[in-house]
Regions:
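S-adenosyl-L-methionine
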Residues: 1-63, 68-96, 163-181, 185-186
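Flexible, charged surface loops at secondary-structure boundaries
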Residues: 37-43, 59-60, 93-97, 123-127
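Hydrophobic beta-strand segments of well-ordered beta-sheets in folded domains
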Residues: 43-45, 64-65, 99-101, 127-134
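Conserved proline-anchored active-site loop of SAM-dependent methyltransferases
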Residues: 45-49, 97-112
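Gly/Ser/Thr-rich loops at beta-strand to alpha-helix junctions
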Residues: 48-54, 109, 138-140
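A generic structural signal for alpha->beta connector loops
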Residues: 62-64, 77, 128, 151
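C-terminal substrate-binding/active-site "lid" region of AdoMet-derived donor-dependent transferases
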Residues: 112-181
């Protein structure tokens, strides 16, 4: 699958020219593969600020997941919703309720309270919903305090980003409120 992901996910060179204000960090092929394999059995997935992950679900599992992002380069995805999570309202079909929300937010330009408010809107204030957030380990305390009602914990999952030097990957962690596949608690 790795070779397929390399050829189908948008070319990382393109994203070297990313818009800096969007603080885009895209997962490596290995991470994309591990995430979609771990979460493939969830039915109603929402990816917030994780467009290459939504792309991988769609291309490799033929799974239409909601992709909420500001980057219109991903508007080819069937359930892409252009949204600035600090300003825009989000609308889903009335009967839609996610069973998994995956978030890989900008680490510096986004207030965690704004992110929490948005996640609450998407989850319809259900803090029992399965939630996975990639975040800076040095900001763990702030993340866990802000999302305390979701009972997040750090997992052993190794985060890797294409546009981040490998020596810095240890600075990122995946926090969830459940264990599944490669996502196990420490």
């Amino acid at each position: 699958m790795n070779s397929e992901i390399s050829t189908l996910v948008p070319d990382p060179k393109t994203f070297k020219e990313k818009k800096k204000e969007q603080e885009q960090y895209f997962f490596t092929d290995k991470v994309l593969e591990q995430i979609i394999k771990s979460f493939q059995y969830f039915e109603n997935i929402v990816c917030i600020c994780a467009p290459t992950l939504a792309d991988a679900f769609w291309r490799f599992l033929k799974k239409d997941v909601y992709c909420i992002d500001i980057d219109d380069r991903f508007n080819y995805l069937p359930k892409f919703i252009h949204c600035n999570i600090t300003k825009d309202e989000i609308k889903f079909p009335n009967d839609f309720k996610p069973d998994l929300i995956i978030v890989d937010p900008p680490f510096f330009g986004l207030n965690l309270k704004d992110l929490l408010n948005f996640v609450n809107k998407v989850s319809k204030n259900d803090n029992k919903i399965k939630l996975a957030i990639g975040y800076l380990i040095r900001e763990e305390k702030n993340l866990l305090i802000t999302f305390k009602d979701y009972n997040l914990q750090m997992t052993k999952f190794n985060m890797e980003y294409r546009t981040v030097d490998q020596t810095k990957w240890k600075n990122y962690g995946m926090y969830t409120n459940f264990e599944c596949g490669k996502f196990k608690f420490e």
